[in-house]
Amino acid sequence: MRVVKRIAVACYLGITIFSGIAFGYEGSFPSSSLEQNPSGVAIHNRVLFKIDEDTVVTTLDVIHKLNILFYSTCPQLVDSVSARSQYYSAMWPVVLESVINEFLMAADAKEKKIFIDPTSVNQEIEAMFGRDLSPFAKFFDMTPGDIFNVVHRVLVAQRIEGMMVRSRVMLKVTPGMVRDRYQKLVEDASQVSQWTYRVLTIKAGSELLANKIAGKVQERLNEGDSWDKERLAAMVLSQGGQLICSDEFIREDAQLSAAHKKALEEINFPEERCGKALEHASGLKLFVLFDCSTKTLEPLEKMEAQIKQRLMMELAEEEEANYKNKLRARYGFDPSIITQLLSEDAPQLFSLL
């Protein structure tokens, strides 16, 4: 259950739409103000973005989300200042952008009168953390209201994103697009070879004996069509050697190492299926090729759902970018704002104690 909760909270970082305005806006938060909480983080709280006349994004908003993410992913390290130091420093840029995304989408949702029932928010909080929220007060100086605000904003952002992106994507993916993509996959597959093979290792007391045994193994495999590992091993053992047989490999061209591909291509298949012995530190190697054929795909009926899902993912990126650009235009977002906030010359937003 804890793993599921961690994944659920970590998924908040998947929202990658970011924008905002008024870099350095002071509002009612002096840039010199300093708040310290039990997490070992000194927060230089100030307004980072002004969304509208009623809504601003502050350093504390970002820290609150960092606190929730840290506790969700690393509860066993909640009292480790060094662990938080590493986590907060690494995650700050990503979480900063995600919080700005959420504020902008929440503002958009408000305009469109899209709301989340408080009961749903409380249920989500309980599903993630249980009913005991005291660790947030003890280690992060966060109230239940602070937690509610973060989770509520995330859920609102997810809902509006679903309406503005996912619903449009579903309408765009047509049966014709699926068929065209399948045909393209078929054409690509026809250019790919698929190799089915094993690698045999022959060991013996001397190099001469090993080569002699390897020659007999090669001869036997090239004479018949049957594959009998046990009989082959018995034959090698009777000659004073040892046979080690790999599992059966099924590999496409791109999945083959250069050495394996070279060895397989030297086999005169299908007239032969076992190549010449190759010297190796672990013993003599014999490559046994069972099949080399053009890659084939399953029927469209079996791949349709998979192809449709892939197309939706691709179109979602496009729709998300469109939605992002509209939000930027509406709220006057300048991409350089994020760069300024994260630059080395920018005023510190928080300090690790």
Swiss-Prot record:
Keywords: Signal. Residues 1-24 form the signal peptide. GO terms for molecular function: peptidyl-prolyl cis-trans isomerase activity. InterPro entries: PPIase_dom_sf, Trigger_fact/SurA_dom_sf. Belongs to the chlamydial CPn_1058/CT_355/TC_0634 family. This is Uncharacterized protein TC_0634. It comes from Chlamydia muridarum (strain MoPn / Nigg).
